[in-house]
């Protein structure tokens, strides 16, 4: 069998305003900045690179492919897993995050809550729910 495709080493989100996104991700959510240049800011989240990239400066990465035009609605959906969705939700609310869905148990066995970053990317916090035997 050939090389395996079974790991994601980085997530890169295109953003409209790099400074606004840096303030949200570092200042509100809290991960440390690992690198920063005129086009992007990189954070380390549990061993994975998480990068916000100014969309109008993504020429090298897109190699001539057009970038999306501004539109309404979510463009990405990301999940962070936690052992206590209610505690993480309360902590993020204290830091100024506005949730559009409060923590609730879902039929797929998770307790989830949802918020958006400044560019409308949807984040889910998810906690596995212990099933009764």
Label for each model-derived stretch:
Residues 1-9, 32-80, 87-116, 127-133:
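Vicinal oxygen chelate
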Residues 21-26, 92, 120:
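Conserved active-site tyrosine of GNAT-family acetyltransferases
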């Amino acid at each position: 069998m050939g090389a395996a495709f079974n790991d994601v080493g980085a997530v890169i989100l295109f953003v409209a305003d790099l400074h606004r996104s840096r303030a949200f991700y570092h200042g509100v959510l809290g991960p440390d900045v690992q690198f920063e240049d005129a086009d992007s800011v990189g954070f380390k989240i549990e061993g994975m690179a998480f990068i916000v990239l100014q969309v109008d400066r993504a020429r090298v990465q897109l190699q001539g492919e057009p970038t999306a035009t501004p539109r309404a609605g979510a463009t990405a959906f990301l999940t962070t897993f936690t052992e206590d969705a209610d505690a993480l939700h309360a902590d993020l609310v204290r830091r100024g995050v506005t949730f559009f869905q409060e923590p609730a148990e879902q039929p797929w066995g998770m307790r989830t809550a949802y918020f958006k970053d400044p560019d409308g990317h949807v984040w889910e916090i998810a906690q596995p729910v212990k099933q009764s035997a």
